[in-house]
Amino acid sequence: MSSKSGLFLPLSSVITSYNENTNLSLKTIDAFLGFLVVVGGLQFGYALLVGTYPFNSFLSGFISCVGQFVITVGFRMALTQQELQSSSSKKKSPVVSPYKRAFLEFCFSSLVLHFFAVNFLG
């Protein structure tokens, strides 16, 4: 019994720390990242089981999931970095908020990614 609790103690410690120290917006982004992993995994599993007959469709969908995952990780990193910088120093605020800039970059890059994904469908 004690060996099982010894195995799960670090995991429960990480989960507790994550729940206490992570704000809601980052948790929402993490949930979206999990969703993208599940959707990409389902698409890849479907391609393995059934086949990739419309290969453009498979590539477009799978690469769209992977690309959106990468873009979202970059967005999360930008938000985390801005939180660390804002808590450590009090600099003069720029014209555009770093949070707004990160969100606009996320939106623009997502639009470009999905524009190319839809065009690749043929």
Swiss-Prot record:
InterPro entries according to UniProt: DAD/Ost2
GO cellular component: cytosol; nucleus; oligosaccharyltransferase complex
GO biological process: protein N-linked glycosylation
Pfam families, A to Z: DAD
Its membrane topology: Multi-pass membrane protein
Complexes and interactors: Component of the oligosaccharyltransferase (OST) complex.
Protein name: Probable dolichyl-diphosphooligosaccharide--protein glycosyltransferase subunit ost2
